[in-house]
């Protein structure tokens, strides 16, 4: 079965938090027999910051950010059995969605894969004229990066034929325990780009604890922080490529996950970083959000902080022995229940069920 997948980038994680999600899922789907072509625009300098080579489990087509190139790649949707348009591609998303739907065969399954569902739904609720309201009627299936029942209910209320969350997970071939790297040694590390809808939470959950714990060392990775005034005990690394994620996660005493505003408000939205860190055997501290216990057990496999004061207290009292035990427990859990192999099995079942239903309807 052929999949045409239109997304932000498979080759680069630069300003592209969905990269490892796409890689893990599509690699696992390829192992289940899918023939996949991923179409990504050359925008935001991502091609200058590639952190993987073109994979052997998926063809990648990089296109210029022009209307002509967009229409050319959209025409390729006609060759696919499953046509996926992801949210947040980064170049003319609305035009691309309409173009791929126009070019998809009548017998193809059309999918809108929302990697930012809480934010998308908020925009739809606040803008009755948003074009996606009408376009949803043309889409066979909505898959989401997470969000649980609240996202499913909202999408169905807006007219989606079907909506299923496909959560982030672990690819143990790329994210796994490694030897510590002294360059990442610290008491607490946070990896995340500077985003308008997360910065206040980063201030509260990372920078404020750093100021309180002035004698401890904090490490910041991610793009966009260059002009941010930092506490003296915070070191900024800039963009940290995928190849360095394991060492970044496993070396500090603990690593921190901070959700974006919309993800925290909605809940049920574990970030890729959660599973990447757990897969490396890291001790992970996360901001509190609804549903965390469905993925990792608080206090045993993950530490949950309600605010910056909680983060400071956790870091102050956390011993290396306990940190290692929490990381080991998290690793066992994600290997057993949260791999992309398991997520791909769910996606495969959904796709096959769709085509089986269609075949039965045609036979009636």
Where are these regions (language model features)?
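Anion (oxyanion) recognition and catalysis
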Residues: 30, 104, 156-157, 210, ...
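Short, solvent-exposed loop/turn segments at secondary-structure junctions
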Residues: 9-12, 42-46, 89-91, 116-118, ...
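Conserved catalytic-core segment of nucleotide-activated headgroup transferases in glycan assembly
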Residues: 171-254, 264
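Extreme N-terminal starter segment of soluble prokaryotic enzymes
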Residues: 1-3
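Hydrophobic anchor at the start of a short beta-strand
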Residues: 34-37, 110, 162-163, 216-218, ...
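Catalytic binding pocket for nucleotide-activated donors in carbohydrate/polymer assembly enzymes
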Residues: 7-11, 21-24, 39-46, 50-57, ...
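Extended catalytic core of nucleotide-activated donor transferases of GT-like folds
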Residues: 6-7, 15, 19-28, 32, ...
């Amino acid at each position: 079965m052929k999949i045409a997948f239109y997304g932000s980038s498979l080759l680069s994680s630069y300003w592209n938090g969905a990269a490892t999600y796409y890689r893990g899922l599509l690699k696992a789907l390829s192992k289940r027999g899918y023939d996949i072509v991923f179409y990504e625009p050359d925008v935001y300098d991502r091609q200058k910051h590639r952190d993987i080579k073109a994979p052997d489990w998926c063809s990648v087509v990089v296109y210029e950010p022009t209307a002509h190139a967009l229409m050319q790649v959209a025409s390729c949707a006609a060759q696919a059995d499953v046509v996926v348009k992801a949210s947040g591609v980064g170049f003319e998303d609305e035009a691309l969605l309409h173009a791929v739907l126009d070019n998809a065969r009548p017998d193809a399954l059309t999918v809108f894969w929302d990697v930012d569902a809480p934010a998308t739904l908020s925009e739809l609720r606040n803008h009755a004229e948003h074009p996606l309201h009408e376009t949803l009627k043309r889409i066979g299936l909505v898959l989401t990066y997470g969000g649980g029942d609240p996202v499913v209910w909202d999408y169905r209320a807006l007219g989606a034929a079907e909506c299923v969350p496909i959560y982030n997970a672990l690819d143990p071939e790329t994210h796994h325990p490694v030897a510590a790297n002294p360059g990442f040694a610290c008491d607490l590390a946070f990896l995340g780009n500077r985003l308008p809808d997360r910065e206040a939470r980063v201030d509260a959950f990372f920078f404020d604890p750093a100021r309180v714990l002035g004698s401890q060392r904090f490490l910041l990775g991610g793009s966009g922080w260059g002009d941010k005034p930092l506490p003296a005990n915070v070191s900024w690394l800039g963009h940290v490529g995928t190849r360095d994620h394991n060492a970044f996660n496993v070396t500090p005493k603990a690593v921190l996950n901070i959700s974006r505003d919309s993800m925290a408000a909605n809940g049920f939205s574990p970030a890729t970083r959660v599973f990447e860190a757990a897969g490396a055997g890291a001790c992970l501290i996360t901001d509190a959000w609804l549903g965390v216990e469905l993925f990792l057990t608080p206090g045993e496999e993950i530490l949950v902080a309600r605010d910056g004061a909680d983060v400071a207290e956790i870091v102050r009292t956390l011993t290396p022995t306990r940190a290692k035990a929490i990381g080991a427990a998290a690793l066992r859990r994600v290997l057993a229940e949260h791999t992309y192999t398991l997520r791909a099995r769910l996606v495969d079942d959904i796709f096959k069920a769709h085509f089986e239903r269609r075949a039965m309807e045609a036979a009636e």
